[in-house]
């Protein structure tokens, strides 16, 4: 028999379905001169049923790379596509009338208008569908039939800070936990914090609530502690239940806005963010500019309104200012409605005030020609309020709304009536990359009060001295192209008896070839506390990669205040180990006292099981040492998994037996010793892809596909299961009982004890084949034809120890 040499690498590149780097090669099989029937399987490998990893295309658009079962049909293979798979690919199932299924719930494609072509050589499945059976294209929201409520699980986020000061030997602690439990569509959440500052201990529970989505009516039901909607009235904390339209389920919806908190710290400081008196966030910051972004605020369950920011300086000074957190103009498309209903008890952080039961309802409806009408009520035994308003989408000029409110505050002696009106304006200028948001509310009479003001004033007459007359806020964001960008935030509260308080935060940023420049200005005034201060900061960052071959930056920062304080700060910042390690070393000199010098060191590490950090500061009179740790824990049916902090919506990655595999896009996130990890920052109701880096797989492990698509509902912990092959990777030479090698093109199927095919490979020259995931307990079945007699079972033995990546074995097929 004449033989032609073909390398094993080429054969496995063409036919080994588990290889994600495969290429297509073409051969003249006639040149092999094989005996009749010996190469039958080789030349028609696509007719052999089994599990194959394929690229799935619908009308020439790649939908996913996944493992599918292909069943044998006449002269071809037919993929097993379930109804869920077709929905996932964008097929409108309701348009496929009389759809038929086999016993394995696979759609019988021959009875549908859906056509397919399977190409075994390049591992692709081409689906073609007429436009009439395609779902409407929506770049945001996935089909609700594949929304995944996730697994039942207990989850916990934790964060702890510790600081020790040598002077006085004081220790301070701050801890925060976010326990939760998922059961079906229900989400139970809590946020609690504990702090010990200068021997003063304090524990707070910001909220505890249960929540679920109602996809049929695109709404969200909440029971427990939450905040009311801020569309018409000020957001207030309550304990009760609410039903709200959930816009995250709506295509092209108006997404929730979260503010960015910016400020300037003059020393090592603690920043606390509160809303309605509740502590929702606390962190330590070094001197200079700081920014608390959307990522830190989004998962804390805050309500729309005003965020109170306090900066506690090391020298005892305290900065206080507010950050407006307002909603855009209430402008809805024609026929679209939005509502919220709340019944509960007002939840006051200070027990000195009353907490009455109240009802609040709001309704917004979009009309033709860009008009929107809205109205709402607040009812309580000591207070009633009514609101009506309208908005107009004025096209290229933005959107404008007007609302009118009336309130009745009930006292022991009389009812006090008041009125207020408000104007909001939003504009996004695409041509100039400008975003403007303005909001102004004027209390037409002194007796007008919001719900919160009525609660406070009913118990304390001195509240009248702080009765608001108006409140104005503005947000401006302007991109300047190559010149950088500018951000401006302004908030002014005026009172009937005094000027009130004002805060202005302005910043400018510019980046040129890696060199970044940042200017920041903060002004805060308060006639109530008689606090006035202006802070200015200048920051310059220069990359040092070309000099050090590492990701490092040199920074200079100058901070000054209207109280004649000026600091010069010089430092080096670095990132290493694929962004897992960040570190910083800085020195500071105070202009007021040339001898007042300080040194700051800090570093943080993001790993598989969480994040840990340490900081050190030193000057002539004090020395501080601090540590912080944070992370997340999920307890599920398969055990307990530790990881980095869990976002509101996340995935539990399962790759059994594969430890140390890296999840792409998340620094430090790798599978643990069992093959589990946590992948956060998923977007609810949308297609999310979770990818594992195949180059990080340990020796003698393999995964059938590297990308998994999930569509979680809000708050879900979805399971992303990777099919793994753990065991010896071997080059095995297989012979028949007569000593002759298996024929070229024979298909090897590795089956587990349940008969499920784990992997397939093709026999090459001289009966050799590459097989992955051998453990000695699976069945290795060889097949070379379509008749039942054209199979045999391969018997082999594994070495006791495998020091290399590939074992070389011999096997006999009987």
UniProtKB/Swiss-Prot annotation:
<dbReference type="InterPro" id="IPR042186">
    <property type="entry name" value="FimD_plug_dom"/>
</dbReference>
<comment type="function">
    <text>Involved in the export and assembly of the SefA fimbrial subunit.</text>
</comment>
<keyword id="KW-1134">Transmembrane beta strand</keyword>
<keyword id="KW-1015">Disulfide bond</keyword>
<dbReference type="InterPro" id="IPR043142">
    <property type="entry name" value="PapC-like_C_sf"/>
</dbReference>
<dbReference type="Pfam" id="PF00577">
    <property type="entry name" value="Usher"/>
</dbReference>
<dbReference type="GO" id="GO:0009297">
    <property type="term" value="P:pilus assembly"/>
</dbReference>
<dbReference type="GO" id="GO:0015473">
    <property type="term" value="F:fimbrial usher porin activity"/>
</dbReference>
<keyword id="KW-0812">Transmembrane</keyword>
<dbReference type="InterPro" id="IPR025949">
    <property type="entry name" value="PapC-like_C"/>
</dbReference>
<dbReference type="Pfam" id="PF13954">
    <property type="entry name" value="PapC_N"/>
</dbReference>
<dbReference type="InterPro" id="IPR025885">
    <property type="entry name" value="PapC_N"/>
</dbReference>
<keyword id="KW-0732">Signal</keyword>
<keyword id="KW-0472">Membrane</keyword>
<dbReference type="InterPro" id="IPR000015">
    <property type="entry name" value="Fimb_usher"/>
</dbReference>
<keyword id="KW-0998">Cell outer membrane</keyword>
<dbReference type="InterPro" id="IPR037224">
    <property type="entry name" value="PapC_N_sf"/>
</dbReference>
<comment type="similarity">
    <text>Belongs to the fimbrial export usher family.</text>
</comment>
<keyword id="KW-1029">Fimbrium biogenesis</keyword>
<dbReference type="Pfam" id="PF13953">
    <property type="entry name" value="PapC_C"/>
</dbReference>
<keyword id="KW-0813">Transport</keyword>
<dbReference type="GO" id="GO:0009279">
    <property type="term" value="C:cell outer membrane"/>
</dbReference>
<protein>
    <recommendedName>
        <fullName>Outer membrane usher protein SefC</fullName>
    </recommendedName>
</protein>
<feature type="disulfide bond">
    <location>
        <begin position="792"/>
        <end position="813"/>
    </location>
</feature>
<feature type="signal peptide">
    <location>
        <begin position="1"/>
        <end position="30"/>
    </location>
</feature>
């Amino acid at each position: 028999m004449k033989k032609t040499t073909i390398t094993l690498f080429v054969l496995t590149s063409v036919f080994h379905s588990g290889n994600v780097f495969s290429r297509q090669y073409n051969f003249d099989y006639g040149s092999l001169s094989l005996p009749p029937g010996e190469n039958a399987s080789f030349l028609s490998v696509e007719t052999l049923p089994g599990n194959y990893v394929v690229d799935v295309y619908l009308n020439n658009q790649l939908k996913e790379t996944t493992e599918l079962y292909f069943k044998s049909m006449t002269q071809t293979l037919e993929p097993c596509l379930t109804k869920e798979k077709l929905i996932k690919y964008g097929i409108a199932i309701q348009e496929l009338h009389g759809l038929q299924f086999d016993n394995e719930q696979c759609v019988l494609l021959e009875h549908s208008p859906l056509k397919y072509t399977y190409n075994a050589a390049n591992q692709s499945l081409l689906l073609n569908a007429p436009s009439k059976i395609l779902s409407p294209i929506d770049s945001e929201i996935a089909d609700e039939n594949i929304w995944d409520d996730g697994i039942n699980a207990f989850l916990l986020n934790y964060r702890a800070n510790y600081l020790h000061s040598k002077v006085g030997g004081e220790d301070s602690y701050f801890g925060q936990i976010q326990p939760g439990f998922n059961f079906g569509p229900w989400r139970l959440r809590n946020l609690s914090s504990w702090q010990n500052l200068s021997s003063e201990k304090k524990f707070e529970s910001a909220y505890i609530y249960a929540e679920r989505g109602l996809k049929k009516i695109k709404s969200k039901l909440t029971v427990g502690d939450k905040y009311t909607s801020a569309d018409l009235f000020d957001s207030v904390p309550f304990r009760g239940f609410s039903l709200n339209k959930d816009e995250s389920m709506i295509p092209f919806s108006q997404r929730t806005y979260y503010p960015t908190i910016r400020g300037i710290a003059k020393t090592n400081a603690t920043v606390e963010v509160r809303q309605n008196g509740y502590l929702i966030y606390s962190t330590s910051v070094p001197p200079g500019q700081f920014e608390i972004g959307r990522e830190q605020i989004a998962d804390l369950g805050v309500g729309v309104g005003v965020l109170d920011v306090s900066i506690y300086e090391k020298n005892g000074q305290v900065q206080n200012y507010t950050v407006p957190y307002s909603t855009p103009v209430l402008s809805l498309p024609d026929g679209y409605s939005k509502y919220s209903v709340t019944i509960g008890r007002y939840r006051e952080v200070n027990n000195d005030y009353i907490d009455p039961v109240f009802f609040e309802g709001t309704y917004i409806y979009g009309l033709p020609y860009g008009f929107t009408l809205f109205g709402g009520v607040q009812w309580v035994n000591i207070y009633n309020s009514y609101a009506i308003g309208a908005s107009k989408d004025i096209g290229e000029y933005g959107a404008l709304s007007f609302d009118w409110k009336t309130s009745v505050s009930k006292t022991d002696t009389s009812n006090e009536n008041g009125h207020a009106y408000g104007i909001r304006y939003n504009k996004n200028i695409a041509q100039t990359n400008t975003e403007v948001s303005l909001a102004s509310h004027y209390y037409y009479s002194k007796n007008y009060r919001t719900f919160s003001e009525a609660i406070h004033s009913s118990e304390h007459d001195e509240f009248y001295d702080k009765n608001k007359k108006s409140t104005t806020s503005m947000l401006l964001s302007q991109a300047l192209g190559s010149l950088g960008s500018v951000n401006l935030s302004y908030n002014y509260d005026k009172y009937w008896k005094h000027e009130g308080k004002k805060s202005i935060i302005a910043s400018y940023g510019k980046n040129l070839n890696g060199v970044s420049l940042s200017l920041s200005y903060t002004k805060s005034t308060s006639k109530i506390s008689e606090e006035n201060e202006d802070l200015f900061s200048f920051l310059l960052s220069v990359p040092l990669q070309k000099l050090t071959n590492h990701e490092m930056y040199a920074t200079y920062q100058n901070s000054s205040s209207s109280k004649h304080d000026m600091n010069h700060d010089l430092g080096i910042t670095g990132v290493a180990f694929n962004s897992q390690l960040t570190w910083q070393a800085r020195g500071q000199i105070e202009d007021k006292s040339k001898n007042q010098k300080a040194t700051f060191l800090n570093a943080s590490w993001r790993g598989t099981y969480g994040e840990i950090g340490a900081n050190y500061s030193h000057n002539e009179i004090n020395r501080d040492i601090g540590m912080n740790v944070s992370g997340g824990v999920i307890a599920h049916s398969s055990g307990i998994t530790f990881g980095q902090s869990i976002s509101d919506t996340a995935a539990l990655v399962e790759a059994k037996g594969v430890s140390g595999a890296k999840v792409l896009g998340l620094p430090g996130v790798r599978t643990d010793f069992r093959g589990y990890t946590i992948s956060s920052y998923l977007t609810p109701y949308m297609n999310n892809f979770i990818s594992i880096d195949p180059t990080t797989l340990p020796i003698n492990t393999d995964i059938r596909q590297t990308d998994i698509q999930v569509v979680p509902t809000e708050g879900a912990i979805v399971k992303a299961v990777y099919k793994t092959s753990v065991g010896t990777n071997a080059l095995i030479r297989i012979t028949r009982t007569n000593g002759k090698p298996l024929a070229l093109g024979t298909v090897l199927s590795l089956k587990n004890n349940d008969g499920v095919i784990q992997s397939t490979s093709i026999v090459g020259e001289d009966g050799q084949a590459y097989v992955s995931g051998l453990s000695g307990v699976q069945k290795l079945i060889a097949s070379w034809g379509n008749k039942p007699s054209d199979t045999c079972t391969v018997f082999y033995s594994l070495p006791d120890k495998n020091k290399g990546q590939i074992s070389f074995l011999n096997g006999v097929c009987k």
